[in-house]
Amino acid sequence: ALPISAGQIPIRFRDWDVDALSVSGHKFGTPKGLGALLVRGRTPIEPVLSGGGQERGLRSGTQNVAGAVALAIGLNESNARMQAQYRELVASRDMLIDAVRRVVPRADLTGDPVRRLPGHASFVFPGVTGEALLVDLDARGIAASSGSACAIGRHEIPATLLAMGLEPSVAKSALRMTFRRPLAREQIERVSLALEESYAGLTRR
């Protein structure tokens, strides 16, 4: 199944050449553990849970009605917010990317420069590890990530970057910044200043 950042980009399941698509509610503000799987037509799928035959025999067990309602409400609200703020988020992302490149010219943006999530900026910083940069930025009041959420705390090299062809020595210097609301110019300046000072300090050691 193709995992999608629902509520951040328009979902066009009918137009996409995929058999299945999954969404995780915590990505758009619902309680953790809620999600949905969209399966195209007659795509064969094996159930993980068996028993009572609920949900067309694909997921047996008592249905979480409250969770399903929360997922639907969260997705509706997130989609409405996305439509209202999409352009602002893209502008904030691009301003942040430009600011980071300005203060740390050696930083390389990972992924496609245009076809990316509106509130997402990921870089590699030669000469430092993402973990060291993350810790230093945290001390300066800046929250970021050095890998995917499912690998946090394990100090692993981001598998996505390795799959994109980056060398392990480069991939381990990754830092990811995400946001769900448009950033003010002052916020971007604060992040870029902290990053400039942090990177300079770490590369001098």
Residue ranges of predicted features:
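Pyridoxal 5′-phosphate
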Residues: 3-205
